[in-house]
Amino acid sequence: MLVLTTETIPGKGIKEVKGLVKGSTVRCKNIGKDIASSFKNLVGGEMNSYTEMLTEARQIAIGRMVDEAESLGANAIIGMRLVSSSLAAGAAEMVAYGTAVIYEDA
């Protein structure tokens, strides 16, 4: 599955638009890692446990979006975007969305 942030596919034509596809996940850290991150916040520096959590959340959200596009018979997603939001202390939602299309050589 081709996943692009652009609205077009260079050298290809859009044969059919299948529609909006999306994938989401809500992730949280366990209390031990959350406490460790709180200490890191006091002294500065990267909060590795949160970086890992968001990386995993992006991968899951994109994977779910791709699954939805494949179920529609699409071979690409264009205009892909990621949105994250904080839901509660230590929890974050990640949403991936885009337009599922079928492309062909131009």
UniProtKB/Swiss-Prot annotation:
<comment type="similarity">
    <text>Belongs to the UPF0145 family.</text>
</comment>
<protein>
    <recommendedName>
        <fullName>UPF0145 protein CPF_0876</fullName>
    </recommendedName>
</protein>
<dbReference type="InterPro" id="IPR035439">
    <property type="entry name" value="UPF0145_dom_sf"/>
</dbReference>
<dbReference type="Pfam" id="PF01906">
    <property type="entry name" value="YbjQ_1"/>
</dbReference>
<dbReference type="InterPro" id="IPR002765">
    <property type="entry name" value="UPF0145_YbjQ-like"/>
</dbReference>
